[in-house]
């Protein structure tokens, strides 16, 4: 099991990178080359389970712990959710200690898992990937399938043809009710004894879409998430599972087109709490996040040629996207602030406020309103004086923060009706 790329592999990856950039110029280099339509980027917790067997207590899963996570759900290529496609679930854990393997980001405190709603990938190696991307770059702008690659695959790898033809054929009821797989393998430990694949399995209690199939529009998958997390205010729960394999030969590692027959075991639980996730700021945050399987601890390093392709192509396309959008690419800390759950108690709302101010709030709450039950009450005393003073005071519409400026030329992506979270500025959100 080796991760050292040969000169042929390096040349192939460089060609794939150039083809990917060509595709991005077609869709707009400010967008992701793949999975550019997101349904939502949500806050979640990732809880490593207690009492795991010894062989599973490795790296990230060595001890029980709860991580803050961001999860981005997306379509692979389609704008219209009603059309069949591959769908993505990208998970970013924050607060993960330990040195990471991505060059230049070894000290980052994040760890990524990149998954899709199909258990296997349709490409075996770099040379096949080059052939596919070259044909795809020619056919995609015309809205046509890569017919030349399909013909080549039928002749040379007929067993892989059903994998390719079925790859983008999923129609989801809800992103929260689907199963997802890593497709490609990863190490499980510092040695070469075990490889693994990851999968995410939804709880049976996760709601499916309440939108009947005949009423589904091109954006119904985000609506399904909103129905579940915001309107019904229900959590979405998933098992995070690993599938270990003792066969770490190149035949197994470099063939992601075949499912493994080994057992699948739960090692963590993902909980997405009820939340509102559709603000302009949070959607922009999700668009600006970069996910790569190489944001990882050494114990969980990506294996095989396809992961080597992803390492360089993901990094290159992410760099192009952020440069085009004039956004600095930064990893999140887990302390980004949005109103994930608007149902706050009075105690939570007044946390950190001193007692004097709480007393003022209590006094205001106890004061009878000027208008009550349709009967107009005449203000007296200090209330009357305050009203007269207020009526003489000029009203200023100038915002206290440039982010809230009325001008449509504002470059801040924070909604003007809300207080701008400072961490959103730190993430460098682009113009709307």
UniProtKB/Swiss-Prot annotation:
Keywords: Plasmid
Residues making up the signal peptide according to the UniProt record: none
Gene3D superfamilies found in the cross-reference section: Catalase core domain (2.40.180.10)
Transmembrane segments: none
GO MF term (any one): heme binding
Record-given protein name: Uncharacterized protein y4iL
Originating species: Sinorhizobium fredii (strain NBRC 101917 / NGR234)
């Amino acid at each position: 099991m080796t991760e050292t790329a040969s000169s042929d592999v390096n040349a192939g990856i460089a060609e794939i990178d150039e083809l990917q950039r060509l595709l991005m110029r077609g869709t707009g280099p400010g967008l992701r080359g793949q999975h550019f339509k997101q349904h939502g980027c949500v806050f979640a917790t990732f809880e490593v389970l207690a009492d795991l067997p010894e062989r599973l207590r490795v790296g990230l899963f060595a001890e029980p712990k709860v991580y803050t996570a961001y999860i981005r759900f997306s379509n692979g290529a389609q704008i219209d959710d009603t059309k069949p496609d591959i769908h993505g679930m990208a998970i970013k854990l924050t607060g993960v200690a330990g040195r990471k393997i991505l060059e230049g980001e070894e000290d980052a405190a994040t760890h990524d898992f990149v998954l899709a709603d199909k258990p296997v990938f349709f490409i075996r190696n770099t040379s096949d990937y080059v052939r596919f991307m070259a044909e795809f770059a020619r056919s995609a702008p015309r809205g046509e399938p890569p017919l030349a690659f399909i013909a080549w695959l039928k002749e040379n790898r007929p067993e892989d043809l059903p994998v390719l033809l079925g790859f983008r054929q999923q129609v989801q009821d809800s992103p929260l009710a689907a199963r997802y797989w890593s497709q490609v393998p990863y190490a499980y430990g510092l040695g070469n004894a075990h490889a693994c694949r990851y999968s995410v399995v939804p709880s049976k209690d996760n709601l499916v879409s309440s939108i009947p199939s005949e009423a589904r529009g091109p954006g119904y998958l985000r609506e399904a998430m909103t129905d579940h997390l915001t309107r019904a205010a229900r959590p979405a729960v998933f098992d995070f599972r690993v599938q270990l394999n003792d066969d770490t030969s190149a035949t197994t590692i470099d063939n992601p087109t075949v499912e493994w027959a080994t057992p699948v075991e739960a090692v963590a639980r993902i909980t997405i709490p009820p939340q509102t996730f559709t603000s302009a700021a949070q959607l922009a945050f999700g668009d600006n996040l970069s996910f790569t399987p190489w944001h990882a601890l050494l114990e969980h390093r990506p294996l095989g040629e396809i992961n080597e392709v992803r390492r360089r192509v993901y990094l290159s396309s992410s760099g192009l996207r952020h440069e085009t959008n004039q956004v600095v690419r930064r990893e999140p800390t887990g302390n980004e602030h949005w109103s994930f759950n608007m149902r706050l108690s009075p105690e939570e709302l007044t946390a950190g406020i001193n007692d004097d101010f709480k007393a003022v709030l209590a006094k205001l709450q106890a004061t009878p309103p000027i208008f009550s039950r349709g009967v107009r009450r005449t203000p007296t005393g200090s209330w009357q004086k305050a009203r007269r003073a207020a009526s003489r005071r000029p009203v200023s519409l100038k915002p206290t923060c440039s982010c809230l400026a009325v001008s449509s030329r504002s470059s801040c992506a924070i909604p003007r009706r809300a207080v701008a979270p400072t961490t959103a500025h730190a993430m460098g959100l682009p113009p709307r």
